[in-house]
Amino acid sequence: MATPQFSCLLPAFFLLVVFLFLLIKELRRYKSPKTTQKLPPGPPMLPIIGNLHQMASSLPHQNLKKLADKYGPLMHLKLGEISAVAVSSPRLAKEVLQTRGLAFADRPQSVVAKLMLHNCLGVTFSRYGDYWRQLRQIFAMELLSSKSVQSFSTIMEDELFAMVKSIESEAGRPIILADKLISYLYATLSRATLGRVCKGKETLIEVTGETLALSGAQSLEDIFPSVKIFAYLNPLRPKVRKLFNRIDGVLEDIINQQEKKLLSARVDNDQLQPEENDMLSVLLKLRNGKDSKVQVTNNDIKAIIFELFLAGTVGSSTTVEWAMSEMMKNPKVMEKAQHEVREVLKGKKRICQSDIQKLSYLKLVVKETLRLHPPAPLLFPRECRGQCEVDGYTIPAKAMVMVNCWALGRDPEHWIEADKFEPERFKNSSIDFIGNHFEYIPFGAGRRICPGISFGATNVELLLAALLYHFDWELAGGMHPKDLDMLELFGPGCTRKNPLSVIPSICIPSHDDN
């Protein structure tokens, strides 16, 4: 007779023990004297899981909007052991992000972020303080300033030309537009970040994609932090460790390559040649500079480079795909945008970064796209640094704060026909997307506003200008514009559920000479 196999019972046994532990905690909490805290209103909670079932929706930003319509624009939720607050009005978004910005300047740190970014180094997930302020200064003054973005114009134009040639080679056949956009963005980001020639780029891009696929995953370890056994049972940990080991080794090799290249190519009193003035070179100069006010380590550099790749592709590609989708569905907008681009750029064979400033209607299209389809509908969550009060309600310390900028951009109190795609609504309007108008904050606002707005917006405008200038477009399969679905898929960004499949036809061929 075979020996009985009891090992298969171990997971069930552990889950039973954990369930009983959480149940006892819940009963103790229920029986303990009620606190005098006045929490924001919110939907009823289930034992142990709280409101997790309501956040398990495939489109949590839409679900939170429906709940806010019932419970109010400042709403309390319980996600396992984590207190969470959802903000769904411009007035309260301003209160949280600006008026009391310091109280909400931290970020929650997930298991994935801790493991992939050297315990949350870098500017995105690090705690608010001196370290974060120093890194923010590096981004603002060195890496992603308007001057720095302008210096990448040749790179952007070269890679844009390559993308146009690639689309031309498939003219008359259906293409998945997002594939072309992501290829352009990875190529541009690689050169701007690491330089023209660098071994390991392909692995970096591959791991970036795999990490993005995991980045939105919430583990039991994140939502029940007091249950330490979840750290051992978490199936994400081995996957993420494997990814981290790959990316850490690749980035270490890339740094070593760059150091050797800079040592051998240094001329004219340590001035870098134009092709070597990439972001990694800037970071290495800061690391090596004895007089530098901001000191960085190799681990800081690796975290910064990796988060640039994580953040620099999804948002821009998603925005362009949504803009093209909206224009395909609204042919009059497409016609008007194409007419402007072709009139302004008449006779040109290649598009330059400097041309974009003349395309006023295209900029309205981008603004309207970001209103309806912000790259991160719930922004990156904030964390309350200490118990405080907002609008007469207590916000607990360590509460996760989610600002629903998708709901803000569709608030009928601030937008006429809020669900309609109408770029003209921004004509003669002072509203911008740099965090000054809280009914419209697709990139966030306050201290932790996205530092890459200039880089991202420039790429979006260049891509749209090229697509509209060089090509005419029709939907694949003979689909009528009114039948194009606009379903969303929530993930690292809020993308189309069904990728946009279109057929390009060449209108104005590209040419090597400008």
From Swiss-Prot:
Glycans are attached at N428. Heme binds at C450. It is found in: Membrane. Gene3D superfamilies: Cytochrome P450. Its EC number is 1.14.19.-. Keywords: Alkaloid metabolism, Glycoprotein, Heme, Iron, Membrane, Metal-binding, Monooxygenase, Oxidoreductase, Transmembrane, Transmembrane helix. Its cofactor is heme. Pfam families: p450. It is a single-pass membrane protein. A cytochrome P450 monooxygenase involved in the biosynthesis of pentacyclic alkaloids natural products such as alstonine, putative antipsychotic compounds. Catalyzes the conversion of tetrahydroalstonine to alstonine. No oxidative activity towards ajmalicine. This is Alstonine synthase.
